Amino acid sequence: MNDGIMFYANLPSRLLEYIHDETSDSLYYRELADQAPDQRARDLFMEFSRDEAQHAANFKEVYYRLTGMQPMVPPVEPPQIPPYCEAIKARIMAESGDLVKYGEESVSAPDQMLRDLFYITSLIEGRHGLRLTTLMCGVDDEKHRC
């Protein structure tokens, strides 16, 4: 079986996982915004939440195009948010992992539309990780200091 056929054979199940993960990440950032120490951090988390929701929507659209069915994704549990600094550090690691995961999908994708989708998604995830690092310095109150 050639690589393109294998890519497509496994893609629907990967997309279901990605839809679930991106939806979960969107909810996580929305909840994290409630812990934000200032408006700048709150705005950043809400921007990330919207980005992650858009990633899920993009993957749902691809799933539908491939299968002709709406994706059946298990319900997303409400996120358990650790203390602020731990949450930031965990998200930096998660976002950098997503950067790599979607970058690998981009390189493996047999058609341009999927390559572009995964590439752009990987860039946005990488941007999230980098921007999260800016929240680790300059926090004045003890509760949010990293």
Label every model-predicted segment.
Residues 1-146:
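Non-heme di-metal
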